[in-house]
Each structure stands twice: as structure tokens, then as C-alpha cells.
Amino acid sequence: AAAPTIAAKSENNANDKVEGDASNLKLTGNAWALFPRLGYQNRIEFTVKTAGKRDKFGVSLVRGTDADVFYSLVVNDEGEETRKINFEQQGTAGIGFLANGDSYVFQRPADNTYHIVITTDNSICTMYINDVCCYTNRIYGIQRNCWSINSYSGSVEVTGLTVASK
């Protein structure tokens, strides 16, 4: 497994920032860092530390800089102490939250640190968070497209990013 290079990053406005590289990344506001295409079988692993209790972040798959639609696993705050993974269709032609596509609620880590492991096998994607949440869904086209780590609000630090692909 190796740390990927950042292929592109958001440059929306002065409040949305991407700082650092893939080994030590900081996303602020509504920002994203795009990474190269994935293989057919992948293991993505990283740690996210949020600055506040309500900061929101996620991972998008089947994404490119010009994608009209892509799919995101969003770690959404359901309250100050609870989180849930929402499955969303994002992009200029996306419809947002996909009903009945979310996870069970889990407790926000006391230290705001989320250890994330994502495995994909062709179109099956499974996301694990801190050994307390597991979410699986089918997403077509993972292996032909880029992916990103996103901040939707607040400030998130990403460390220890590795990707292993077959």
C-alpha cells in the first residue's frame, strides 16, 4: 500500500481550502482532494480528525473534475454526539441524499478521530469506521474513475492515507 498523489483539488473560494499533500492533508469548508483512478479491488485506509463536534466529511467515488454525477459516503452529523453515513448522489446533475441508503446512527468519537477503511471489489464498496460502523453499497464504475476525500463544513485533517489496488 502506498500514499497516492493528489490529482486535483477544489479551488472554490478563499474560505474553502486544501492544504498539504496526501500524507498530511487539511481540508477546510467545502473542499475536496481528488485522487487517481482505482483498480478492480482496492483498500483505502486513512484517519480523519475533525476540529469540531459538527464537522462533516466524506469520500466520493466515480468522480472526476468534470463529472456531472458521482456517489459519496458522507459522515453526517445527526446531532452533536451522533453520526450516520449518508449515501448521496452529488455533482451538478446529482439528486443529493438517496432515501433508504443511509447507515445506522453511531456515537461521535470523543476525540473526533475517525479511523476509516474502505474496501472495494468491482462494484461493491464497504466502509468501516472505528470498528463501530460498517456500511456496504453497490456503486458501479469505481474501477474506471477517480475518487476524492471531501470536507463539507468545518475543518478536517487527513493522515496516514494509503491505497492498495489490484
Predicted region positions:
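Beta-rich accessory regions
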Residues: A1-K166
